């Protein structure tokens, strides 16, 4: 039987749709996949010896291609002036969209039918928003949806999951850090200190699993700067702490590290947990509440034939695919995962600007 693949589109528009989504098979597809990925890396470091299948190798090559496109689109306009997102990100985004079918072709060559119309849609939206030049948990969710589609197509198998996280996802994170640093992507939502990270959620979710069985390292260890410096390349959670500590210092004295309590109180609170296993469990609950359960985020989620839309959800309207926000927020105030917010420069952008203005200082200011 020939599969009929269709371009995924937005369907969720209101709280009634959100309730349907929360009880749907599509919701379970994403949540179960994330939980299975999390469970697959319990106790594993980023450099653990894992089986790298041919599909995983192709995924790593896909990310290499994304890196090449970044190199093709350097920042030249107002390079040292504007502290907001760099417009060259749009050139990067356009090139991704133009080349994504070719980039993804090796992944699907063995399939009878070509699903790239669906895969490319999630893939293209995994890097940020072209109009707002920002990035947040909704874009990260698109990358997970892309991987979930590969799993449903049989390209990624359960035995690939450890490699998908400690090789593929960590490489995706490296690509995203490069994009954030080069194009000064703004944090989607702009929740500042009340978020886990200006951009990401999942490295904390997967990273807590890596540490869940560690015999010595405790949650409060994130306050030990020397320990974080020694192990951040091995654990995603510590990489995020290292990244945050690096970009959030005092403008007057770049060498002066600020307390997590000051610039990341949520992470500071989480560090008081009794064990990483508790944090691992809590991260799933938080992901359900603050990402999959937030209308401003899932209003942007797209449904095709691989991840079908739940019955009863609002019909698709062409204007729902506007490149800008294109929705209201239902009159609600969101605690973490809002897709929109006051347009502010990222802490990373402030960091890079300070290096330009104060070349003799080390990074980096947080304002």
Swiss-Prot record:
GO MF, one term, reads: protein tyrosine phosphatase activator activity
* Cited Pfam families: PTPA
What subcellular locations does the record give?
A: Cytoplasm
Q: Which GO terms describe its cellular component?
A: cytoplasm; nucleus; protein phosphatase type 2A complex
Show the InterPro entries listed in the entry: Phstyr_phstse_ac, PTPA_C_lid, PTPA_sf
Q: Name one GO biological process term.
A: response to osmotic stress
CDD domains linked: PTPA
Keywords tagged on the record: Cytoplasm, Isomerase, Rotamase
The portions of this protein that span the membrane are: none
Q: Which family does it belong to?
A: Belongs to the PTPA-type PPIase family.
Role: PPIases accelerate the folding of proteins. It catalyzes the cis-trans isomerization of proline imidic peptide bonds in oligopeptides. Acts as a regulatory subunit for PP2A-like phosphatases modulating their activity or substrate specificity, probably by inducing a conformational change in the catalytic subunit, a direct target of the PPIase. Can reactivate inactive phosphatase PP2A-phosphatase methylesterase complexes (PP2Ai) in presence of ATP and Mg(2+) by dissociating the inactive form from the complex.
From the Swiss-Prot or TrEMBL record, give the protein name: Serine/threonine-protein phosphatase 2A activator 2
